[in-house]
Structure formats: structure tokens, C-alpha cells
């Protein structure tokens, strides 16, 4: 927010990049609050949604003023500020054997077809890290760019998925 205040001192344009899980509520809500302040009424926003590494690249090149993404390993020339924590959940089709369980061990991901995130996404990288750390060998049947795609495939019984609890899950229930 401080960076956005600095960029918008006399109106102007702010280019921001963000990851999909922030698109449904977080980014629109924060930008609306920012624009509702009288001193910011002349600011124009350009929005760009992508994976964390792509956002990082555009922030570094100056194409984006601010980026919102998953944590990347410490980089001396970039600052990272945690804004939100999202619980990870295993998403199953309605009639799936795991669908009745309130708590499901991560190890179950090795017993069913898995719908994952694109490899270059932060969540795809993180999920692969978790699977390796806990020696889980998932049967990854497809990789998707976003939560909408993942939820749609889960609904159609393609498999189960590990994803952050986002507003798309509330709509899917």
C-alpha cells in the first residue's frame, strides 16, 4: 500500500500483477479501498494476472510497479511482505471416498489421480516440494493454470487436487 501511495501521489497509473487466488476478492477489495480515498480518485490501475515467477520477472523489468504472488526464495534485490496465509485443502468430487472425511492425510494424494498446478506456478512448485518432502508419488494426470480449471476437473471426477482455500471453493460447495 505504501508503494501504491508513492506511485499515485498526483494521479497516474499503477501496473500491478497478481496470482489467481487473489483475483476473486483480495485484489479487487484492496484496490477499491485505495481508490475510495479522495486523494487517489485520479489513479488508474492496470491489472495483470499470472504465475509468481512471471510476475517477479515483470517487476524486475519495470513493466509492473507492484507484484502479489507466492513466496520465492529470498532475493537481495526484492522485498517480500507476507499479506495473507491460505490453508491448503484436498479437493475431491462429491461422491469420492475421501469426500466424507473432515481431515485427510496428505499421503492420500498418492492413492488417487491428481489434478495439479502448472509446473512454473508457485503452487505447482510448492506442491511438488511437499510431495517430495513426504515421499508421496502422486499420479499427476493433468496440470492446470488456475483454480477454476482445477475445480472444474475435480467436479467431473478426473481426480483430486491440493489447492489453497480460496473463494472459488466457497462457490463450488
Outline where the language-model segments fall.
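Secondary-structure junction motif
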Residues: 98-99, 113-134, 165
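Alpha-to-beta junction loops
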Residues: 41, 59-68, 88, 136, ...
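Ligand-binding cleft/hinge of the Venus flytrap
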Residues: 31-40, 124-137
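Alpha-helical segments flanking ligand/cofactor-binding loops in enzyme cores
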Residues: 56-57, 81, 107, 151-152
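Alpha-helical linker/hinge and terminal dimerization helices associated
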Residues: 1-8
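Flexible hinge/capping segments at coil-to-helix
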Residues: 8, 75-114
